[in-house]
Amino acid sequence: MDSNTTTSFQDILQRMSKMQLESSSVDLNGMITQFERLKIYRDSLGESVMRMGDLHSLQNRNATWRDELSQKFEEIRWLIAECRNILTKTENSFEQITFLQALQLLLEVESEIRTFSFQLI
C-alpha cells in the first residue's frame, strides 16, 4: 500500500473526528466509519493482488467478492456526494480543506480499487 495514502486516511480521519458540523455528528461519524471500512477493504484487496497465489483462494473463499466490490464503489460514490454536499454548505476553511482532501483521497482510492479489481479479474 502507498504509505502516503495511508497517512492521508489517518490525517483526514483525525481531522474529521475533531469537527462539529452543522448537520449532525451522527452523519459525520457515519462518514468516518465508512472511510475506515474503505481503507481496510482497499488494503486487503491490495494485499490479495500482491500475493497473487491468494487470488484463487480469494475467489474460491469469497464467491461474492464482485458484489462486495460493487458495494464499495457505491459507498465511495456516497462519500463523494457527502463531501461535495458539505463543501457547498460550509464556509469554515478548516472544513473546506479537510473535505477537499477527503474528496481527492476518495478519487485516488477509487482508482486504486479499480486497478486492483482489474488485476483480480
Swiss-Prot record:
GO biological process: exit of virus from host cell nucleus through nuclear pore
UniProt main location, coarse: virion
Disulfide bond positions: none
Keyword annotations of the record: Host nucleus, Host-virus interaction, Transport, Virion
SUPFAM superfamilies assigned: Nonstructural protein ns2, Nep, M1-binding domain
InterPro entries cross-referenced by the UniProt entry: Flu_NS2
Quaternary context: Interacts with protein M1. May interact with host nucleoporin RAB/HRB and exportin XPO1/CRM1.
Similarity-based family: Belongs to the influenza viruses NEP family.
HAMAP family: INFV_NEP (MF_04067)
Function: Mediates the nuclear export of encapsidated genomic RNAs (ribonucleoproteins, RNPs). Acts as an adapter between viral RNPs complexes and the nuclear export machinery of the cell. Possesses no intrinsic RNA-binding activity, but includes a C-terminal M1-binding domain. This domain is believed to allow recognition of RNPs bound to the protein M1.
Protein name: Nuclear export protein
Species of provenance: Influenza A virus (strain A/Equine/Jillin/1/1989 H3N8)
